Amino acid sequence: MFRGKLRTAAVAAVTVVSLCLGGTVAAAADPIVDTGQALGSAVASNGSTLDHVTVVDPRHLTLHVFSASMQRVVPVYVQRPADTSVPRPTLYFLDGQVRREKTDVEEFLADQNVNVVSPSGGENAYWTDWKSPDPVMGVNKWKTFMTQELPPVVDAALGTNGVNALAGMSRVGTAALQLAIAAPGLFRGVAAYSGCALTSDPLGQLFIKITMDNYGYGNPANMYGEADDPAWAANDPYVHAAELRGTELFLSNGNGLPGRHETLDGPGIDGNVATLARQIYAGGPIEAVTNYCTHRFTDRLGELGIPATASFRNSGTHSWGYWQDDLHDSWPVLARALGV
């Protein structure tokens, strides 16, 4: 029985490198930061390529990647490894700027020898390929971007070692599992926090529809078609769970009840009573739904004999404080997948 609570008293993921010769030597300078130029260039099979690089500071840069499938340039935020002297693995952390602003992912992984790559723009489109252009969302081919267009560009530009893992929360947690299934072997590890990996289940479809309707996103019929369209099942991680065999997996969820972050000084609350109330009355029911989804998905993995680390909290809403906790708890699984 692999289901259980992951109780990590401390995450020993930060390594301080010092030489026994009596001093501390800083890592070699990053040539990308120094020159503003990528280490190499690559063109995906469909013509997608790196447009240009923006250096933000000594550890951070933005790759501007042209997507041939969507005919747009996508910003991809990057935190470089602590030591860039040799090729390093890559953690794809979805979605872009907002995840970096709402969690401590950059600080938490600052001392790790891993590229943290956060593409931006596909969250509201579920990071998937839509069947039809949408009046609101336009052309969405995010699965193509994440599995065929972006990886070769990232590997060449950053000089990676080709080892990847993927993490996402909420609807992006669903996408993380879908992407790993769509490209076997591309991502050696996946962490999905509070996702609903039941896209062809009526409750899962309703969850997607409500999310899009409430937040003004596109029409889900343009994504996978009407409710009985085979595309819903074709993109359902539950249906295709067997294809995750051999992938390091971390799944987490709260149960929707108020917990330790439902306080006025909780993450993202900033003393705002209305924000706290919304986190409880909206984030609670949403987390209860994803809890159902995650339990069913872990049950399915168990039936298939596929190992996974599952963390089910006895409280917690659909909110950033818990996802930051989940990131910390999932790091041993992701680190194992990345070989760091």
Regions found by a protein language model. Give the residues of each.
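Hydrophobic core
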Residues: V14-G22
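Non-catalytic cap/lid and distal C-terminal segments of serine-dependent acyl enzymes
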Residues: F2-A12, V25-V340
